[in-house]
């Protein structure tokens, strides 16, 4: 379970999302630099434990720390509030990431109209979704890149975006972007499965800051987890 509160101009939207065990939320805003450093250090320790030979492991730690920090800071400059990454298992991490952002719409257009416009522009009229009572657009695209990654000479990214209106914060939208990278036929099948995983994760999305509403079981669980930290 992970929770998120946007550091954009208040009032912000808070929500809970159930991600697979081991995923880390890395804050991408400059004001949360210390928290980012703490999370990156934790990920590096788990990926490259202290019992590894220092001479060979330390350069890898520095490289991983730099790559993670640079990627998250770049996402922050692009407007993201946070980036979510899967845990590494036996030295392997799934080639997937999730970014979280919030945007404001100063027009008085109804959310359903905005969702319809987004889906029409994308040519994906079947992407209308209800996310915990909020109108949302699900859009997808495959992005090609000439940049090599590992053994792949060229890569593609299956990108799925949920643009969700915040029903209790007029004009506020939560944007969640899932990106699964692949470079050959077997990894493309994995990317397809990861897209299905994201759609399943989005069924767990719950608002946690609805004014006047009694605390939900999700909110109570989140509060208990925060107190236990």
What is the predicted role of each segment?
Residues 2-17, 111-113, 190-195:
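Short aromatic-glycine motifs in intrinsically disordered, low-complexity regions
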Residues 69-166, 216-217, 225-227:
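Signature of long, low-cysteine stretches enriched in small and polar/charged residues
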Residues 23, 123, 178-229:
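Surface-exposed amphipathic alpha-helical segments
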Residues 168-175:
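Short hydrophobic/glycine-rich mini-motifs in sensory/regulatory modules
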Residues 28, 101-102, 206-210:
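Short beta-strand-to-coil "C-cap" segments at the C-terminal boundary of structured domains/repeats
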Residues 13-31:
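Proline-anchored loop/turn motifs at beta-strand termini and strand-loop-strand connectors
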Residues 37-71:
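Mixed-charge, low-complexity intrinsically disordered segments
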Residues 28-41, 212-219:
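Short acidic, Gly/Pro-enriched loop/turn segments at secondary-structure junctions
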